[in-house]
Curated annotation (Swiss-Prot):
MF term (GO), any: structural molecule activity
Region (Disordered): 184-207
Family that this chain belongs to: Belongs to the PMG family.
Membrane as UniProt keyword: no
InterPro entries the record matches: Keratin_matx, KRTAP_PMG
Assembly information from the UniProt record: Interacts with hair keratins.
Pfam family, one: PMG
Taxonomy of the source species: Eukaryota, Metazoa, Chordata, Craniata, Vertebrata
Protein's name according to its UniProt entry: Keratin-associated protein 27-1
Single GO cellular component term: keratin filament
Keywords, ordered alphabetically: Keratin, Repeat
Function: In the hair cortex, hair keratin intermediate filaments are embedded in an interfilamentous matrix, consisting of hair keratin-associated proteins (KRTAP), which are essential for the formation of a rigid and resistant hair shaft through their extensive disulfide bond cross-linking with abundant cysteine residues of hair keratins. The matrix proteins include the high-sulfur and high-glycine-tyrosine keratins.
Top-level taxon in the UniProt lineage: Eukaryota
Length: 207
């Protein structure tokens, strides 16, 4: 395999522009490309005009709602309604830009997209996305204190039943709190006392 014509970029002032990189027997032409140093195993080549590529304009795309615009604690969730999605400034530059930052390696740069600045957007008079409560779609936001906490007491009152008479000869059982319907006793054979009732009926004695 012939030696590659890639030059290591250990110093920027000695890096000549490359026109071709040969792999195997098939020459492949890459115009205006630079090769990474030999410490990178994959021999990846980048465009040397990445500075112009990173400065290209893109449309404004705001994906997250700003919590400062909606601070009502009664609503748990809020929907983000888009205003003007593609907002551009008067100088034909969008509110979202991509900037190039140098990595730890001196051979490559990474493009990082910066979010929209709401201050400059408001000063230019453009409409940005805002957070609106979900109640605008027809779903009301109930207050936090709307949960009823008396289910436990009602259920407890309807399930407790005891015999009020202390006379062992008495066979009538009545509920402690008159919330559930009156329990009905089943007919039993003479001489057998029914036990205390439960909610909705009586227990038959075990034979």
């Amino acid at each position: 395999m012939p030696h590659s014509h890639c030059h290591s970029l250990r110093s920027f002032h000695n890096a000549p522009p490359l026109s071709a990189i040969t792999h195997g027997t098939n020459p492949i032409t890459f115009e205006d490309r630079l090769c990474l140093p030999s410490s990178f195993h994959s021999r990846t080549c980048f465009l040397d005009n990445f500075q112009e590529t990173c400065n290209e304009t893109t449309s404004c795309q705001m994906t997250n709602c700003e919590q400062d615009l909606f601070t009502d604690d009664s609503c748990v969730q809020s929907n983000c309604f888009p205003g003007v999605v593609q907002t551009t400034y008067s100088n034909s530059r969008p509110c979202e830009r991509t900037a190039c930052q140098s990595e730890s390696s001196s051979a490559g740069l990474a493009c990082v997209s910066q979010p929209c600045q709401s201050e400059s957007t408001q000063q230019m008079g453009f409409v940005a996305q805002s957070c609106q409560p979900a109640s605008l779609k027809g779903n009301s936001c109930p207050p936090k204190t709307s949960k009823s906490k008396n289910f436990e007491t009602l259920e407890r009152a309807s399930s407790q039943c005891q015999c009020q008479s202390q006379n062992p000869e008495s066979s009538s059982c009545r509920p402690l709190v008159n919330v559930a319907p009156e329990p009905q006793l089943l007919e039993s054979s003479p001489g057998v006392e029914p036990t205390c009732c439960v909610t909705g009926g009586s227990q038959l004695p075990s034979k």
